[in-house]
């Protein structure tokens, strides 16, 4: 039986311990060699004073490197710290970590994908892999008497690993926190082959950093390499003493760490190039920024997974973009009845295919049972022949000195189960023939009916709204015209009276003061004009 991939991986990465424990490691310092990195929100492009906090003041701190080139030491010995094996040796090159003549410790294995050039880390990995392969070969080659079928180990293998469940739960929790939609039906997929981790830069507004570190051990060096970086803008960059380009357009915020070794809180990493670091020694040749690391997980909606499984041209997907996974759900809601009809047809087709698959499974079970019956007949025939040949010595079991094994034929149970499966398949096929793809649409009617009322109101408003508006406009216009017609006789009567008083001459009998419509001031001014006419007439 082949060992599962994840179990084999964990077995290879664990160092082997000998009976004689190595001496304790001496890579200790009296004062804290590292500080935790803190900062405030800064304006883009500005470099403010560093904010950091020291830990383990006055207490020794163990420091080890995750990678040590073969050219940095002549010899290396094993040492022990916190029940973990490390390598230790003196540096022979001034450019190596620590400097010339300094005793430095590094990890037993380097990380995956990195080689120290044939040094002790590569040799230890090769040795341990050979030991594991030898143990597996010995286990598989060792023969033991048959004692019945034991499926307990198979169940343990098939059981989901605890760390894998924790990884899925953490990813799902983060997905719910950052996604605008609250996804409930989705598929979270991990690749079977090895793929690099994904780097997500720390956002500018992130300030949720822990201020406590519970360990006194520091690992300096890359932890993961060959990262896949999702975004290259709005980065929180780190300014070292040898950094010259502080006007990089990709960096929206700059932070300045101390010059000695410093570490980030748990869950945050320095990404320099394509490698991730937990601690740095205050200098780096490439630009570094703060980032989160997430596994190469892909999020699918049900429709996306269907499109991915069916035989269509497959486009490359970006892993763990959980923050845009609601596109399929929103598209289904936006298309309305059309999308519901498409989904109904898809489920109808899937039900028919599943029915056919169950039929083939039933046929396979019948075929396997026939093979078992044939094999059992052959075994019983051989058993009778062996009993006849070894009858003088008491039979086959006594001749071998083992317990006698007997075959219990349970083909009737298998036949009965297959008959039940066939009955279910036939009943399901009849239901699908009676319902049809459009019959499944009736199951969606309780969801469609609440939308029909508002939809009908909108359609009626669009159809009859312009007519009603025109009627209202015509009614208001007619009322205004009627009011104008009622007011015109009064206005004309007043105008006629006023014109008659000024234009017509006064009669000889009438008095000047009897003129209507003329104010007293106008009458007084009109009297001198009338006297010459009266004198001329006389």
Swiss-Prot record:
Residues 494-538 are annotated as: Disordered. Coiled coil: none annotated. Residues 1-20 form the signal peptide. A motif (CXXC) lies at residues 186-189. Residues 320-340 are annotated as: Fusion peptide. One of its GO terms (cellular component) is plasma membrane. Residues 380-396 are annotated as: Immunosuppression. Residues 31-443 are extracellular. Residues 465-538 are cytoplasmic. Keywords: Cell membrane, Cleavage on pair of basic residues, Disulfide bond, ERV, Glycoprotein, Membrane, Signal, Transmembrane, Transmembrane helix, Transposable element, Viral envelope protein, Virion. A motif (CX6CC) lies at residues 397-405. The keyword Acyltransferase does not apply. The chain crosses the membrane at residues 444-464. Disulfide bonds join 186-189, 186-405, 397-404. Specific enzymatic cleavages in vivo yield mature proteins. Envelope glycoproteins are synthesized as an inactive precursor that is heavily N-glycosylated and processed likely by furin in the Golgi to yield the mature SU and TM proteins. The cleavage site between SU and TM requires the minimal sequence [KR]-X-[KR]-R. Glycans are attached at residues 169, 208, 214, 234, 242, 281, 409. Pfam families: TLV_coat (PF00429). GO terms for biological process: syncytium formation; syncytium formation by plasma membrane fusion. CDD domains: HTLV-1-like_HR1-HR2. Residues 465-484 are annotated as: Essential for the fusiogenic function. Belongs to the gamma type-C retroviral envelope protein family. HERV class-I W env subfamily. The mature envelope protein (Env) consists of a trimer of SU-TM heterodimers attached probably by a labile interchain disulfide bond. Interacts with the C-type lectin CD209/DC-SIGN. This is Syncytin-1. It comes from Hylobates pileatus (Pileated gibbon). The lineage of its organism: Eukaryota, Metazoa, Chordata, Craniata, Vertebrata. The gene is ERVW-1.
């Amino acid at each position: 039986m082949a060992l599962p991939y994840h179990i084999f991986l964990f077995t290879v990465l664990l160092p082997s311990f000998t009976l004689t424990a190595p001496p304790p490691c001496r890579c200790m310092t009296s004062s804290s060699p590292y500080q935790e990195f803190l900062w405030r929100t800064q304006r883009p492009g500005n470099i403010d004073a560093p904010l950091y906090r020291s830990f383990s003041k006055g207490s020794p701190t163990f420091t080890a490197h995750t990678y040590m080139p073969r050219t940095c030491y002549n010899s290396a010995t094993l040492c022990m710290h916190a029940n973990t094996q490390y390598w230790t040796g003196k540096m022979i090159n001034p450019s190596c970590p620590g400097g010339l003549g300094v005793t430095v410790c590094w990890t037993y294995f380097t990380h995956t994908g990195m080689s120290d050039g044939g040094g002790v880390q590569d040799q230890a990995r090769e040795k341990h892999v050979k030991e594991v392969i030898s143990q597996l070969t010995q286990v598989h080659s060792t023969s033991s008497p048959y004692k019945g079928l034991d499926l307990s180990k198979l169940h343990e293998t098939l059981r989901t690993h605890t760390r894998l469940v924790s990884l899925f739960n953490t990813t799902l929790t983060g997905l719910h926190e950052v996604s605008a939609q609250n996804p409930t039906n989705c598929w979270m997929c991990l690749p079977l082959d090895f793929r690099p981790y994904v780097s997500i830069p720390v956002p500018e507004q992130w300030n949720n950093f822990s201020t406590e570190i519970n360990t006194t051990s520091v690992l300096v060096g890359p932890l993961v390499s060959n990262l896949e970086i999702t975004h290259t803008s709005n980065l929180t960059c780190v300014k070292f003493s040898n950094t010259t380009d502080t006007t990089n357009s990709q960096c929206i915020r700059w932070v300045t760490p101390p010059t000695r070794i410093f570490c980030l809180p748990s869950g945050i990493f320095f990404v320099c190039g394509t490698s991730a670091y937990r601690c740095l020694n205050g200098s780096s040749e490439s630009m570094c920024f703060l980032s989160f690391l997430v596994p190469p997980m892909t999020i699918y909606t049900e429709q996306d997974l269907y499109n991915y499984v069916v035989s269509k041209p497959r486009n490359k997907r970006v892993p763990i973009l959980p923050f845009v996974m609601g596109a399929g759900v929103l598209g289904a809601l936006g298309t309305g009845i059309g999308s519901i009809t498409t989904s109904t047809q898809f489920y109808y087709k899937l039900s028919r295919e599943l029915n056919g698959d169950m039929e083939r499974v039933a046929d396979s079970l019948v075929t396997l049972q026939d093979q078992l019956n044939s094999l059992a007949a052959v075994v019983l025939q051989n058993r009778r022949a062996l009993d006849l040949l070894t009858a003088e010595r008491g039979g086959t079991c006594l001749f071998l000195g083992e317990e006698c094994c007997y075959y219990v034929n349970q083909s009737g149970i298998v036949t009965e189960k297959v008959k039940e499966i066939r009955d279910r398949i036939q009943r399901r096929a009849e239901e699908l023939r009676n319902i049809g793809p459009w019959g499944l649409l009736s199951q969606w009617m309780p969801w469609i009916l609440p939308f029909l009322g508002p939809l009908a109101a909108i359609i009626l408003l669009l159809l009859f709204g312009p007519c009603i508006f025109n009627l209202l406009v015509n009614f208001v216009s007619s009322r205004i015209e009627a009011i104008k017609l009622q007011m015109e006789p009064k206005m004309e009567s007043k105008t006629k009276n006023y014109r008659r008083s000024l234009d017509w001459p006064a009669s000889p009998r009438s008095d000047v003061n009897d003129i209507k419509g003329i104010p007293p001031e106008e009458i007084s001014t009109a009297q001198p004009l009338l006297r010459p006419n009266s004198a001329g007439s006389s």
